[in-house]
Amino acid sequence: LLFNRVIYNNYSYLLVLKGSDIESDLVTNILKEYKIPYKFRLKTTRRSFQEATYEITLKSISTDRLIKSFYTIEGIEEVHIVSYNGEISG
């Protein structure tokens, strides 16, 4: 199974970050650094777990490089970038 590591042409994605402590300011700083348009969508918290979801628009960027940037934030344990068509159900 092969995955393309470069995303192209203004597609919408969901950026899902999971971990013990997610600093929203640090996340938005990275998005601004890469000049990625974003909308905050959801934050779920439990005692020792947080999940934050952002809708992002990517042109042509190495997802590996972007993902590594989020892992520099202490407390982030998982980073997911998911294709998104604008609909959320469930």
Residue ranges and their predicted role:
Residues S20-D21, I56-T63:
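Helix N-cap motif at beta-to-alpha junctions
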Residues S60-L66, N85-I88:
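A general structural signal for short secondary-structure boundary/capping elements
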Residues Y38-T44, T72-I88:
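Conserved short beta-strand edge segments in small beta-sheet-based binding/regulatory domains
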Residues L1-T45:
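Canonical alpha-helical transmembrane segment with a positive-inside/aromatic-interface signature
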Residues Q50-E55:
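Short, hydrophobic beta-strand segments
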Residues L26-Y34, S62-G75:
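Short amphipathic alpha-helices in soluble, non-transmembrane regions
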